[in-house]
């Protein structure tokens, strides 16, 4: 199955000059969604993750069913102010701005092997911030899983050395 057939491109969103890769059309199609989760599981299952971390918010959509498929726990990494207990916070730069992410300080019992999942790898800033949060919370990142990689932004080069990185679709 070619997942590009299920991903809509929206020009000038969220800013002029950005080509937004919209995965809501993929989520709409049960066979494409199942294929996506099955493909991620097939390519990351051997990593032996104890937890899947999903990055807010589209990482939740793929991370939670992947965690179920891999028989792992799920840990959300959220935007600031959304988690109720004590958190670690990391700031990062996006393709089109700046932001921050947070994780509960007690998210993992060390040693925990963690797979970080998001819908998109662009500049790498979000994934790197999530990986730093995982480490601060006592986990070890064993891999990254993405639905889409924007290769022209070279975000993969910014990911930490060691953990594997999987992207199902490249633009």
From Swiss-Prot:
It comes from the Bacteria. Signal peptide: none annotated. Catalyzes a salvage reaction resulting in the formation of AMP, that is energically less costly than de novo synthesis. This is Adenine phosphoribosyltransferase. It catalyses: AMP + diphosphate = 5-phospho-alpha-D-ribose 1-diphosphate + adenine. Pathway: Purine metabolism; AMP biosynthesis via salvage pathway; AMP from adenine: step 1/1. It is found in: Cytoplasm. One of its GO terms (biological process) is adenine salvage. The keyword DNA repair does not apply. Keywords: Cytoplasm, Glycosyltransferase, Purine salvage, Transferase. The lineage of its organism: Bacteria, Bacillati, Cyanobacteriota, Cyanophyceae, Gloeobacterales. PROSITE patterns: PUR_PYR_PR_TRANSFER. Belongs to the purine/pyrimidine phosphoribosyltransferase family. One of its GO terms (cellular component) is cytoplasm. It holds the Pfam family Pribosyltran. InterPro entries: Ade_phspho_trans, PRibTrfase_dom, PRTase-like, UPRTase/APRTase. Its EC number is 2.4.2.7. It comes from Gloeobacter violaceus (strain ATCC 29082 / PCC 7421). Homodimer. One of its GO terms (molecular function) is AMP binding. NCBIfam families: apt (TIGR01090), PRK02304.1-3 (NF002634), PRK02304.1-5 (NF002636).
């Amino acid at each position: 199955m070619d997942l590009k057939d299920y991903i809509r491109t929206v020009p000038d969103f969220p800013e002029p000059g950005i080509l937004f890769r919209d995965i809501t059309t993929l989520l709409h199609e049960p066979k494409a969604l199942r294929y996506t989760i099955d493909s991620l599981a097939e390519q990351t299952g051997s990593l032996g993750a104890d937890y899947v971390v999903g990055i807010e918010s589209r990482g939740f959509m793929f991370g939670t069913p992947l965690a179920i498929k891999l028989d792992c726990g799920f840990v959300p990494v959220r935007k600031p102010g959304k988690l109720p207990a004590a958190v670690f916070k990391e700031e990062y730069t996006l393709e089109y701005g700046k932001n921050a992410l947070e994780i509960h300080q007690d998210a993992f019992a060390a040693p925990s092997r963690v797979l970080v999942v998001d819908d998109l790898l662009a500049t790498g800033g979000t994934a790197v911030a999530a990986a730093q949060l995982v480490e601060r919370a006592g986990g070890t990142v064993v891999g990254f899983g993405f639905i889409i990689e924007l290769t022209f932004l070279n975000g993969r080069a910014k990911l930490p050395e060691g953990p594997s990185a999987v992207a199902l679709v490249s633009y």
